[in-house]
Amino acid sequence: MIWHVQNENFILDSTRIFMKAFHLLLFDGSLIFPECILIFGLILLLMIDSSSDQKDIPWLYFIPSTSLVMSITALLFRWREEPMISFSGNFQTNNFNEIFQFLILLCSTLCIPLSVEYIECTEMAITEFLLFVLTATLGGMFLCGANDFITIFVAPECFSLCSYLLSGYTKKDVRSNEATMKYLLMGGASSSILVHGFSWLYGSSGGEIELQEIVNGLINTQMYNSPGISIALIFITVGIGFKLSPAPSHQWTPDVYEGVRFVREIPTSLSISEMFGFFKTPWTCRREILSPTPVVAFLSVTSKVAASASATRIFDIPFYFSSNGWHLLLEILAILSMILGNLIAITQTSMKRMLAYSSIGQIGYVIIGIIVGDSNDGYASMITYMLFYISMNLGTFACIVLFGLRTGTDNIRDYAGLYTKDPFLALSLALCLLSLGGLPPLAGFFGKLYLFWCGWQAGLYFLVLIGLLTSVVSIYYYLKIIKLLMTGRNQEITPHVRNYRRSPLRSNNSIELSMIVCVIASTIPGISMNPIIAIAQDSLF
């Protein structure tokens, strides 16, 4: 009898939970329509993979690419709508969150064609790779709109778990396994630290978990200036710092960038660029280390975009009364990142490690925008620079992936004389590097100029001066690589470039298509900055 009553209660409770979930999905589902498109793409990809023994490779690439494009379209149609909070306060939609979601979708859309040839050459499992990329993208999008501590914790964990799996995707390589283990252990530790910081805020606010309700709770409990808030600020800054990878939370970045590699005997002739079944180009893959993988390109931009969106909301809302404290912490992180990242990048011999330390320096510039905040167009300048950084960084990685597939090396010295063999690739890489360094009239120059100007207007004079000096340092090591690219002296040209197969002037493989898009986006937008700045300013909440 007791068991029967308990069973009935369980059924009633389950029914209530199901009906509440159905009610939320029915009335609030339209607010996460872009995310629902990605979920549908994931399910469709799984169904096709499980129902067919013979994999239709063009369809496997077509489904996630179409899902991402449709999700971007849905976001654009929803632009300028009124901000809304849905799912009982767990999720918020506004222009500010949506522009970061757009940036994440843009990264993923460019990274999928970037990975086509690499996956074919290394003969990795295609479906699982695409599933991990889509799921990580979904986690990043939910993180951008997260409005409570539970969602802020679960969404990045979804992203992080897929990142761990992607970084260790080449599981037969020892270096890849070592990098993944470091990434996993440090990620788990940082998540624990982040949750501990959340617990301090939860207790101090009287048991609130929504961001705005935490502020109201701190006012009601008179705890907004208590030592507990300072402790929470330190722990949360450390936890978010791992995702942003500023110094001194950067140790995992160069190891993961360099550790993602693969060594395998590959057939000498492959049909590549079959993402939509259009192009067939003969390709030769060597038994060499093919590096860096598109995984690194994906992780280098999406994690920073998602973490930046989360950091701005967490610091600006719950820590509204502790602005001086988190400003000081972020200023220290920005200075350390800009100095250490750019100085250590000079000494690197691997392109991947150089880009890893360069990205640490770049996040220092982004932090300036977070510190400036909404008052002096700080967020607008951060969004603008993020957009340019995506194109500059992915364009650089596209060039390096292409060179790695053709030569099997990523040593900086092995790029010597590339211009004599492949002027198009050398020129594309040079433009992306110059834009990363911030040379006029490229997009990177105007992005940094706008960011530094907003910082100067906000009174961050020392931070801006450090940024200017470290930008000059970054130009040095970028120009050092460009000088190698353009050299014509035979004694400096390595066998990798001597044996380089000259590509046709008009090649139609997907890596070059992605590379062209990124190179154009790294150069032309610098000429017409006003529309981009206006859109970024319009996105502020």
Curated annotation (Swiss-Prot):
Signal sequence range: none
The organism's place on the tree of life at top rank: Eukaryota
Coiled-coil ranges (or none): none
Primary site of residence: plastid
Bilayer topology: Multi-pass membrane protein
Subcellular location(s) of the protein: Plastid, Chloroplast thylakoid membrane
Transmembrane segments: 24-44, 57-77, 99-119, 124-144, 149-169, 183-203, 227-247, 289-309, 326-346, 354-374, 385-405, 426-446, 449-469, 515-535
EC nos: 7.1.1.-
Record GO terms (molecular function): NADH dehydrogenase (ubiquinone) activity; quinone binding
Cellular component GO terms held in the UniProt record: chloroplast thylakoid membrane
Keywords associated with the record: Chloroplast, Membrane, NAD, NADP, Plastid, Plastoquinone, Quinone, Thylakoid, Translocase, Transmembrane, Transmembrane helix, Transport
Catalytic reaction annotation: a plastoquinone + NADH + (n+1) H(+)(in) = a plastoquinol + NAD(+) + n H(+)(out); a plastoquinone + NADPH + (n+1) H(+)(in) = a plastoquinol + NADP(+) + n H(+)(out)
Biological process, per Gene Ontology: ATP synthesis coupled electron transport; photosynthesis, light reaction
SUBUNIT field: NDH is composed of at least 16 different subunits, 5 of which are encoded in the nucleus.
Family classification: Belongs to the complex I subunit 2 family.
Functional summary from the UniProt entry: NDH shuttles electrons from NAD(P)H:plastoquinone, via FMN and iron-sulfur (Fe-S) centers, to quinones in the photosynthetic chain and possibly in a chloroplast respiratory chain. The immediate electron acceptor for the enzyme in this species is believed to be plastoquinone. Couples the redox reaction to proton translocation, and thus conserves the redox energy in a proton gradient.
The protein, known as: NAD(P)H-quinone oxidoreductase subunit 2 A, chloroplastic
This protein's encoding gene: ndhB1
